[in-house]
Amino acid sequence: MNIGLVLRTVAHLRSAQVLFQVLRRVHKARFKALACPSVEVKPMVVEPAAKWQSYDGKRFAFLNIEDEFRGWNNTAHGMLWAYNQNYMDWLCQPGMTAAEGARWIDRFIADMPTNRVGLDPYPIALRAINWVKFFSRFPKESTAERRDSLYSQLRLLERKLEYHLLGNHLLEDAYALYIGSAYLKDSRMHGRASRLLRRQLREQVLSDGAHYEQSPMYHCILLDRLLDCINAGEGEFADLVLKPVAVRMLGHLESIVYADGTIPLLNDSAEGIAPEPAAIFAYARRLGLQWTPVALGECGYRKFDNTDVEAVVDVGNIKASYQPGHTHADSLSFELRLGGKPFVVDSGISTYDKTPRRQLERSTAAHNTVVLAGKSSSE
């Protein structure tokens, strides 16, 4: 272990992160089956952006690895693969039927007593949003038993908010509580979610509309879910808080995206994970939003383009210094396209597992820049 590296990293953590790292080990919140207090729901009315095809009726495909269902706790392909299975994104993929989706929801509910992975806060958050979208699309599948399970999972999420990580994880928690409580018409939960969401958007979305973890892929993911919040919510909070932030984020995406509609693979970014920019723009238009490109500034990226040349350069520092989990040591790295085709590319990422491969992909040596004195630029 490199003690100096550990100390230089820990020095940037916030006191709340340290405190909640301890608390979550001492006090482990348990799942409790509860009855949803409301019998009415408020479904989304605008069609969301479609999810990538990850389930073919027999096998799941996540992170370029295919396998059949072997239980919710199947970590043979790594924890992130198991997380993806528990997100249940495939409920929102094209071609998903009401009967097939309901069957998987019922199977999940039946298996909850032995499901360890699926009751981690991040999978709860993403799954809750997917369930709301599915129930909005197929209202007859929103039975009392399934709503009770959704409500119980959201109540567990309230007790397991990811203050030990902060960053996009806590923002996703806020999104889920906001969308879930809007659907279930739970005013208490909705008020708490609105306050948390307001604080996190204020902190995490930079002045030029970029998400502060500086990953174009995560920017698309978080913008898509912000649009989901606008779809689920209503009133002054949506109009005065959510929509202005969404417009700014849309303007940033418009500025950073390449002419062919793809994103630069900077920091933790890969293809086939987030909704495509075109799908996000179409979703925003269905919600009645209008935006214009926002000049790249605080995000640290600069884009140069003319008829034949497009270049994106990273000239900034790490913004979320207390949560650099999706950041790479890529200072002054760049991508270059000539005649609309990739010429100098970033390698992107292939894994989140704690392996030498993960460390290499985040290092300066893996990017289009120089290594000085054998050290990554983060050092």
Predicted stretch roles:
Residues 69, 78-246:
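Aromatic-lined, polymer-binding surfaces characteristic
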